[in-house]
């Protein structure tokens, strides 16, 4: 299948590499044509001038640009009726997200949202165990979302907040694993170390307590700096079993008892932590373009996760729990 990758940055490179590895014909586009040319040369695929993207025929499109360009690009690609893989978020506002979804429905265009954690093998296995009843009645979920290095000012300008950028992944997983909506949230936050977050009314630490419509209680902790590495973990507790996901030799934490033989080098970033997940997600999109599978992560997923993030921000402002 012929797939156009729009964006020649870090995620564009990952998507192009994985799609090429899965047998797709990839053409890279970027608003800076030279960047597309350089990446294509590195990967051994085609590139083309950005202005030519609509004059060529493709079986699918990947939108891997900066967040603030997503809506404009999606609005121009959706009427073509071909499947689109868009990195999260579709937009930082519910209104724009709804407009994109409505247009996609009008043209029958499938938009797969880039929530790669769904494709992480241990997380996927845990979700299946929950679905199969192996964990029993769900009691609680404990989630950890800890970045290794704090964000740059350039990144912060367009990220939204720790809830819209980082925790949307957690909100999506909660909905996906529990198969229920998030009903109520209570969030607290602080700037403990990295003052650049205060400039944007953001935080470098966060703590969220939430409840799903099915009654599952969830606790989430987030940090923008973990000196040991990138730490994303999930613990699931139920009436039949308790599961730990993301706890392995490369988990960036020190075991005081010394029982776990940790590797000398831990996960240093989200790409390393979820590299296999990104590959499986790209492969799923390739299958979607072939009509072999249904959409594994439809745009409603992005919309609902965003709504929860906004509810967390409202909770911060009011100091009270907020119904989603």
Predicted regions and their residues:
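Hydrophobic residues in well-ordered beta-strands that form the structural core
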Residues: 86, 111-113, 220, 245
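C-terminal helix-rich "cap/oligomerization" subdomain common to oxidoreductases
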Residues: 20, 24, 60-63, 98, ...
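A short helix->loop->beta-strand "cap" motif at the edges of active sites that frequently abuts
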Residues: 80-82, 107-109, 216
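N-terminal Rossmann-like dinucleotide-binding module
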Residues: 1-43
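Beta-loop-alpha module in the N-terminal Rossmann-like domain of NAD(P)-dependent dehydrogenases
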Residues: 43-103
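A contiguous active-site-proximal alpha/beta segment in oxidoreductase catalytic domains
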Residues: 68, 92-152
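Rossmann-like dinucleotide-binding domain that binds NAD(P)(H)
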Residues: 153-217, 223-228, 300
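NAD(P)-dinucleotide binding in Rossmann-like oxidoreductases
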Residues: 198-199, 213-280
């Amino acid at each position: 299948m012929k797939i156009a990758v729009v964006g020649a940055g870090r995620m564009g490179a990952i998507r192009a590499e994985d799609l090429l590895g899965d047998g797709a014909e990839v053409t890279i586009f970027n608003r800076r044509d030279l960047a597309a040319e350089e990446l294509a040369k590195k990967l051994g695929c085609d590139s083309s001038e950005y202005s030519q993207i609509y004059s060529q025929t493709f079986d699918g499109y990947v939108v891997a640009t900066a967040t603030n360009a997503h809506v404009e690009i999606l609005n121009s690609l959706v009427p073509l009726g071909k499947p689109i893989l868009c990195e999260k978020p579709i937009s930082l506002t519910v209104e724009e997200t709804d407009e994109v979804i409505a247009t996609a429905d009008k043209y029958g265009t499938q938009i797969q949202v880039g929530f790669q954690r769904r494709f992480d093998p241990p997380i996927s296995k845990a979700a299946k165990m929950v679905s199969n009843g192996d964990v029993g009645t769900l009691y609680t979920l404990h989630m950890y979302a800890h970045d290794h290095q704090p964000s740059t000012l350039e990144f912060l300008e367009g990220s939204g907040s720790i809830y819209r950028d980082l925790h949307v992944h957690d909100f999506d997983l909660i909905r996906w694993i529990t198969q229920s909506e998030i009903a109520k949230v209570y969030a607290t936050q602080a700037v403990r170390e990295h003052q650049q977050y205060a400039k944007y009314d953001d935080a470098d630490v966060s703590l969220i307590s939430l409840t799903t419509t099915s009654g599952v209680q969830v606790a989430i902790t987030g940090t923008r700096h973990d000196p040991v590495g990138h730490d994303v973990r999930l613990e699931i507790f139920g009436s039949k079993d308790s599961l730990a996901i993301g706890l392995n030799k490369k988990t960036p934490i020190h075991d005081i008892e010394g029982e776990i033989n940790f590797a000398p080098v831990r996960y240093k970033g989200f790409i390393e932590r979820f590299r296999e997940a990104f590959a499986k997600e790209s492969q799923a999109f390739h299958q979607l373009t072939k009509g072999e599978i249904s959409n594994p992560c439809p745009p409603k997923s992005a919309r609902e996760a965003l709504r929860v993030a906004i509810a967390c921000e409202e909770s911060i402002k009011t100091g009270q729990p907020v119904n989603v």
